[in-house]
Amino acid sequence: MSVDQTLYSRARAAMADPTCAGPATFTAAGAFSQPDLMAFSLPEEEPIWGFDTIAPSMASWQGKMEQQTFCNPNMERGLKNTHVRNGQPTPPPFDDKKLQTPMGEMYPVAQYAFNSSPPEYAPPKHRSSLSEQSQTDGYGVSTRRRKASAVDQSEQQQDREKREKFLERNRLAASKCRQKKKEHTKLLETRFREVSSKKGELESEIEHLRSEVLNLKNEMLRHAQCGDEAIKIHLAQMVRLITSKDTPNRDLVSPMRSPEQMTASTPHGLSFGFDGPMQLPSEMGSPLDQRRDSEQSIMTESSYTFSTDDSFEELINV
């Protein structure tokens, strides 16, 4: 049995062992036994191993070992690091750092069966992709929030501008309304002053006209007994108006009676708005009696005084 066949068979048995919980580890006792070492043909011409006791003629075997491909790189690395001392192969130097094997080297056969390059770990990439995705999601959310906040700020700015315009229009309308109200108030005040002044003028004119009418009536009454027909007719109209107010239920003129009978039946002592009775001229009297009566009426002072204000108002309206 050759060395390469023995090592390959032992490595395959260690890997196929179902009781082995972890990967096959390299041991000197398991890899090389005494009968296997005795099968080596070591010529003494070539000192490969650096010992005088062993004649290394392992050139051909070393070439075979270099050409041999091992499925387990750990075993190959262990064989390269082994030393043969006193005819016994020794394990490589103990290293604490190499005891902690990474998770990627637990099952090397399954990993290197499909790809001869060193394994690339997917979980860190997945974590980095998740972090990148979370970063991109956070960036998208932040951008959306910024956009929403910008939209809200623009809407608030538009609402504020609309409110300012509305308030400005209200202020302008209120100022115009106040100005119109002031102008209307001034116009009313001016009109009130004008109407008040006109009213005062009219009242003074009424007083003047009243005094003038009173003077004219006094003058007419002073000439009542002169025998003028116009004065007599005017006095007769005044008598009819006054008697109509004194006796409202009586007819002024009866259709069956003539004006002469009415004047004859009229008593001579009516008030006519005067305090003292006034003697009316009689149609049947003599001219001497008429003259005497007229002189008597002129000489009486009480005939020119009026009784009430109502009769005076009626005299004005004649």
UniProtKB/Swiss-Prot annotation:
SMART domains: BRLZ. It is found in: Nucleus. Disruption phenotype: Leads to a decrease in aflatoxin enzyme levels, down-regulation of aflatoxin accumulation, and impaired conidiospore development. One of its GO terms (cellular component) is nucleus. Keywords: DNA-binding, Nucleus, Stress response, Transcription, Transcription regulation. Pfam families: bZIP_1. GO terms for molecular function: DNA binding; DNA-binding transcription factor activity. Residues 79-100, 114-164, 247-304 are annotated as: Disordered. InterPro entries: bZIP, bZIP_sf, bZIP_transcription_factors. GO terms for biological process: positive regulation of aflatoxin biosynthetic process. Residues 160-199 are annotated as: Basic motif. Residues 202-216 are annotated as: Leucine-zipper. Residues 160-223 form the bZIP domain. Transcription factor that acts as a key player in the regulatory circuit that integrates secondary metabolism and cellular response to oxidative stress. Regulates the genes involved in development, stress response, and secondary metabolism through direct binding to their promoters. Particularly involved in the resistance to oxidative stress in asexual conidiospores. Binds aflatoxin gene promoters carrying the cAMP-response element (CRE1) under aflatoxin-inducing conditions. Belongs to the bZIP family. ATF subfamily. This is Basic leucine zipper (bZIP) transcription factor atfB.
